[in-house]
């Protein structure tokens, strides 16, 4: 009913706010994704609005798989893993998403799952979807583990099991198992390796 429509953004945002408040980050939920209303994101989203597909997918189809909407959005919103990925000439540097933004990601995943799969929605559907799709993300393993833990705990024991004091301690415990950044070497660097036609 709501998928990929203006109503879906409102429905998604209201669900993010609900889950964020349950996670103890009400203000973060309230200001979630406000950049969607900036000219860069909003105007292009209107231009590439389809009704059955995300505007980013439609824009990519028109621009050789590049989306200005996506680049602008993920570069301004700290709950997106792309925000925490940096590049040097020879390596990709993947940082952990800080605690508050990782919780916002949890709220975002739960809400998106509810919007896009309303008939079958439950927390484990969201958990499994994230687990499968995050395999292709350049996401720090500590962040991934924390997000999966939060969703499973909320599913098994309710939001009381992931209240701030508990989830913050778990975030620190998981984070301490990993280095702050993961370095991914880049091979075949340089445009000389590509044929430009």
Q: Where are the language model's segments positioned?
A:
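Metal-dependent phosphohydrolase cores
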Residues: 1-196
